[in-house]
Amino acid sequence: VPIYVTENGAACEDILETDASGNMRVHDTQRIQYLADHLEMCAQAINEGVPLKGYFCWSFIDNYEWSFGYSKRFGIVYCDYETQRRIPKDSAFFLRDVIAGYGD
């Protein structure tokens, strides 16, 4: 029976900062480490013969969580709830690079 990880993510303290170029950034190193650790375990499971066929990160974008409302941010894309502006977090770039390198 194939296995799919359908919701894996972490609410971390995301602090919106302005970098030297004036761009808004979120340096979410805790989330990156969390995702890296879980992806490493997924790879290990596959190498050991587990039929893991898919992995879905929770969540693409910050959203309303039933248990926490808007107080916790799980997304790899920061959402300014007042303006709806979206800013990719460092974890989004991390996952982009992981996906781009898949199979290497």
Regions inferred by a protein language model and the residue ranges of each:
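Non-catalytic scaffold segments within catalytic domains of secreted glycoside hydrolases
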Residues: 1-104
